[in-house]
């Protein structure tokens, strides 16, 4: 059977806006969650289970957030949720091979477990509509004007989640004939007399509704991450007539460092540490010195790439510690500027970055002031399977 998914991204998220202190203007589904937009994580959770995924929404950020995924181009959303679903269904109906089954998923639910999605699909073999849900366990009170008027029995009460699954033809027909608002598509089937089955949902399948939900979602993601550590070491000789660039900052000195790029030994060793933690080789693998494209290149570009690779793998940087080894120049006066520059390039808080210096007590090539050495240690968190 051919399975399609509608990924809804037209909602504005007014409750989230009211609770957020961040000042960001983007809708909740486009907020960054451990290095990826919320909606991208939602799409990636569905893709292994479906043949076609169709985003529904008009925000310019939608295409950017889903760039590179094997999905259909977005279709416009509607004024209300049911309008967006209907627009998506009509678009699917026009495909050369319309689906047999359709999943409808909120773009603000980024952490739906694979088993929940698969259980919904499996239940559609015997039901026209299926929703994942979790049983209500708290005591429910009904109130008026701040005063309790009733205690509602919780037996048989469930909290509905998505993706909700349906026979495609059934849901399309009901949307064409019932244009009044519903909070979800299961309610359409219920009103028309079609039984809708429930499968076990998950407490991890959190919908981003208020700002505090971001922390809960981060906790879900972090449970599936493993710590990794990377070490970097690099050396560059001094050379007359070049600027001295260290950790992205120009440092006044009589000499610069020799190298194919700008020879920023601090950034080079930090890149090596990051690539090592990711098990992706070293800086030379990504930016080979044999390629003249990188001749005299600002090494900031290399570090931006290394940081992007962490995020593309679904991880984040815990901390980075860079040590510069030289007799001169003195690093201390520039260390804070270096920290801030590295943090900016890696898109992390400066509190996660350390830059310090030491000497070799006038021993060896650094003691003879023939060059500068640098070491770096990084700690990152990435998914257990190493995939985004």
Curated annotation (Swiss-Prot):
UniProt binding sites for a divalent metal cation: 234, 236, 268
Molecular-function annotations in GO: 2-C-methyl-D-erythritol 2,4-cyclodiphosphate synthase activity; 2-C-methyl-D-erythritol 4-phosphate cytidylyltransferase activity; metal ion binding
Cofactor(s) in the UniProt record: a divalent metal cation
Residues with site note (Positions MEP for the nucleophilic attack): 154, 207
Catalytic activity: 2-C-methyl-D-erythritol 4-phosphate + CTP + H(+) = 4-CDP-2-C-methyl-D-erythritol + diphosphate; 4-CDP-2-C-methyl-D-erythritol 2-phosphate = 2-C-methyl-D-erythritol 2,4-cyclic diphosphate + CMP
Family as reported in the entry's similarity comment: In the N-terminal section; belongs to the IspD/TarI cytidylyltransferase family. IspD subfamily. In the C-terminal section; belongs to the IspF family.
Name of the protein this chain belongs to: Bifunctional enzyme IspD/IspF
Native source organism of the sequence: Gluconobacter oxydans (strain 621H) (Gluconobacter suboxydans)
Organism classification: Bacteria, Pseudomonadati, Pseudomonadota, Alphaproteobacteria, Acetobacterales
